[in-house]
Amino acid sequence: MEVSINGARIHYERSGSGFPVVFLHAGVADARMWEPQVAAFSRQFDVIRPDMRGFGDSELPPTPWSPVEDLLGLMDELELKPVHLIGCSMGGGLAVDFALDHAERVSRLVLVGSGVSGTDFGSKYPELHAEVEAADKAGDLDALNQAEMHLWLDGPRRPRGYVKQPLRDLFLDMNARSLHSDFDSAPSRHLDPPAAKRLHEITAPTLVVVGDQDLPAIMNTADLLMKSVAGARRAVIHDAAHLPNLEHPEEFNRLVLDFLLET
């Protein structure tokens, strides 16, 4: 399905019925990363999975844009209010920003290996990003994709190739699409001031999910969320890196469904 939002054609998938749950993908992925969640969640919820602008099958016009405004536009177009937001990495950062700007539209938050705007924990671990930065500097998109797959899918403390097929091919295909998008021609506007110093304003019940093999910067961000968001709870998925919903879908589904279905 497609809809025009703020001058861009945005692709999304929708299934099930009930209270709406919007899944926001990571920056190395697209809506397909949530495929292992669709059957379990759509039995009880209206499941919406957009490809964000420049990812998957959504276009990226060469104009300024705002991820928060795109999400708001999608929710308005689909008449969704309020919703549960589930976001991974970049999608988690968007969920946080959206919850700060539009608290009345968010019922519950699930933040998976989440980013938070205004943090820079990654700069503390430059050695982990050396291979990625070298491939990026060389302009070798295939090498960059492979390096990012090891960093984000395998995780920095597990051997290269630890995560098996078909997840490796899925990662490479999802990430390749965004690597070929020209984000330099479409500058994005972000929350100002950023979320890092405003996390105490979040009022939605919040579940912070991390894989124990994720990057240390992601662990630092999870610690910040736990310290700053009132009542936040943490769930650690063992033997999982940055995309725990793909590595251990049954455990992830159980944890998140239990949280969303609380009364």
Model-identified regions with their sequence ranges:
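Acidic beta-to-alpha connecting loop that harbors the catalytic carboxylate
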Residues: 17, 212-214, 239-241
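Active-site loop/oxyanion-hole signature of alpha/beta-hydrolase fold enzymes
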Residues: 35-42, 48-90, 254-257
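Catalytic active-site module of serine/aspartate enzymes centered on a nucleophile-bearing elbow/loop
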Residues: 231-263
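Conserved HGGG/HGGXW glycine-rich cap/lid loop of the alpha/beta-hydrolase fold
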Residues: 6-60
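Structural signature of beta-strand start/N-cap positions in the alpha/beta core
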Residues: 20, 44-46, 81-84, 105-108, ...
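Conserved serine/cysteine hydrolase catalytic core
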Residues: 173-227, 236
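Conserved alpha/beta-hydrolase catalytic His-Asp/Glu region
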Residues: 123-124, 138-193, 198
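Flexible "cap/lid" loop of the alpha/beta hydrolase fold
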Residues: 97-101, 107-138
